[in-house]
Amino acid sequence: MPGRITKTLALFLSFAIFAVTILSAQSPTPPSQPATGPGGKQYVNASVTKNRYGKAGEEYWIFEPAEPKPASAPVIVFLHGWGGMNPLYYGAWIDHLVKRGNIVIYPRYQLNLLTPIREFMPNTLTAIKDALARLRTEPGHVKPDLTKFAAVGHSLGGVLAANVAALASESGLPRVLAVMSVEPGITEPPINVPLADLKKIPPEALLLAIAGDQDTLVRDVDAKRIYKESTRVPANNKDFITLVSDSHGQPGLIASHRAPTAFDLAYDSGEGIGGGPAEVLGGNRGGSDSAGGSDRAGGLPTRRIDGSREGRPDRLETMMVNALDFYGTWKLFDGLCDAAFYGKNREYALGNTPQQRFMGVWSDGVPVKELKVTDKP
């Protein structure tokens, strides 16, 4: 009798797995990365040069465009979420930004999970200033174009990005022309991440505050606060945007708090996923490494999780790269920087335009749910 029950259970499980597989195969798939335009895979550089400097909470990485190596390039400060000290968590996004011709500075700002919050902003500013000085004076680097300076951050880094824009002038940093805070938080008790006086953000800056409709961790509280408190930035230079989840196909597009992460092992600092202080302290601080990063022109390497393809690892499914990146955060920030630096592609980032709201099309021709854009959050 037990043997018969076991066989029956095994048969049932096999049928269930088969049914799920067939159902998944019949489900529409999400859009892949567009060929051109903001968020697209038309890159001006084929590889990325990676350098790591500093120590403890003042450590930072510099990622520079290569193949070909430009004489100069705009500078983007990328600020990770709490605990995201390892660049691998945002590696695919960093790769995208650098191959578009930008230098990316990635401040660590916290040695480990025990670093006091009060140290985050001083560590960030120190790292940025040191990185810019190194880029300007140390041989072999791409020269930083300090007239084209931007900041982007996710979660706690979204608050820090807004702070960088507000404190740039008094801190001796270049003027921030574009700033995007993605699912920022948390300035409320008991976390109490300090938020600078955002009235100091100059009116010529372009600003986006972004929330996810399934972000149950930070919600939209601080995104709204950043939008509302940046009072000198006129409404036509900023937008409040909500990423909208869509489960029309498989895998679904879920705008959770982890949606903006973009896992890529090519950007692993050596600490791995959730690496501790022991690995951090044992790492190289000044070596360089040129690597091709994620090749989006052909087959995507397994080191990067792509949500538009099958076989995503369940453990890291919330860090997959998908249309919420290509048509959401990546497109928006590309357009914002293009508008601020070169006076083009503004319609992809600002103004509640069709290009800004568009999120691609499922494989069955159904449009992905559009972004929600407002200037009255």
Model-found features: residue ranges?
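Bacterial N-terminal signal peptides
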Residues: 10-21
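N-terminal cap/lid segment of alpha/beta-hydrolase-fold proteins
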Residues: 26-71
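Gly/Ser-rich "nucleophile elbow"/oxyanion-hole loop immediately N-terminal to the catalytic nucleophile
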Residues: 67-71, 118-156
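Short beta-strand element of the alpha/beta-hydrolase
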Residues: 72-81
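Short amphipathic alpha-helix adjacent to the substrate-entry channel of hydrolases
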Residues: 88-105
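Short glycine-enriched nucleophile-adjacent loop
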Residues: 158-170
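The feature captures the conserved acid-bearing segment of alpha/beta-hydrolase catalytic domains
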Residues: 174-253
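C-terminal catalytic-base region of ester-bond hydrolases, centering on the histidine
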Residues: 227-377
